[in-house]
């Protein structure tokens, strides 16, 4: 009798395990549309981070004395690297003319800055552009 119970137990276990080895059907999700109220699509504004929003303003067209890195001054002769470093080290500025109050500027440097006032702008400090040392070394090498 014990042998028959053992044999029946082993056979039942084998039969149960054999069912798991076969391929199972994919579970079909039921549709809840019949239970739910029809949904109306909502028009949403495309999300935009603060850095991209600032780039769409005057900041993207001129050099922002509070947020731009040193390399942006390369395109203007005489500003890179000495004046650019002084401008960035003494930021923030409330208006473009404040850059003339930098300590240790020569008359020639002041004239050079004045001649480039139309290329400068001042906006509020943006952490995305000022965190770490990105204003001095933004990691772009030629």
From Swiss-Prot:
A cellular component annotation (GO) from this entry: extrinsic component of membrane
The UniProt record lists the keyword Transport: yes
Annotated compartments: Cellular thylakoid membrane
One of the protein's GO biological processes: photosynthesis
Lipid bilayer topology: Peripheral membrane protein
Source organism, top-level taxon: Bacteria
Family: Belongs to the PsbU family.
Subunit organization: PSII is composed of 1 copy each of membrane proteins PsbA, PsbB, PsbC, PsbD, PsbE, PsbF, PsbH, PsbI, PsbJ, PsbK, PsbL, PsbM, PsbT, PsbX, PsbY, PsbZ, Psb30/Ycf12, peripheral proteins PsbO, CyanoQ (PsbQ), PsbU, PsbV and a large number of cofactors. It forms dimeric complexes.
NCBIfam families registered for this protein in UniProt: PRK02515.1
The protein, known as: Photosystem II extrinsic protein U
Organism: Trichormus variabilis (strain ATCC 29413 / PCC 7937)
Lineage of origin: Bacteria, Bacillati, Cyanobacteriota, Cyanophyceae, Nostocales
């Amino acid at each position: 009798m014990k042998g028959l119970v053992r044999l029946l137990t082993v056979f039942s276990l084998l039969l149960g395990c054999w069912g798991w080895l076969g391929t199972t059907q994919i579970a079909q999700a039921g549709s809840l549309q019949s239970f739910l109220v029809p949904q109306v699509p909502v028009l949403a504004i495309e999300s935009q981070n603060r850095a991209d929003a600032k780039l769409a303003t005057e900041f993207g067209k001129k050099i922002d004395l509070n947020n731009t890195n040193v390399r942006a001054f390369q395109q203007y002769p005489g500003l890179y690297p000495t004046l650019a470093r002084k401008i960035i080290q003494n930021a923030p500025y409330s208006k473009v003319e404040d850059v003339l109050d930098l300590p240790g500027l020569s008359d020639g440097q002041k004239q050079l800055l004045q001649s480039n006032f139309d290329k400068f702008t001042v906006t509020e400090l943006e952490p995305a552009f000022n965190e770490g040392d990105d204003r001095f070394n933004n990691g772009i090498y030629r």
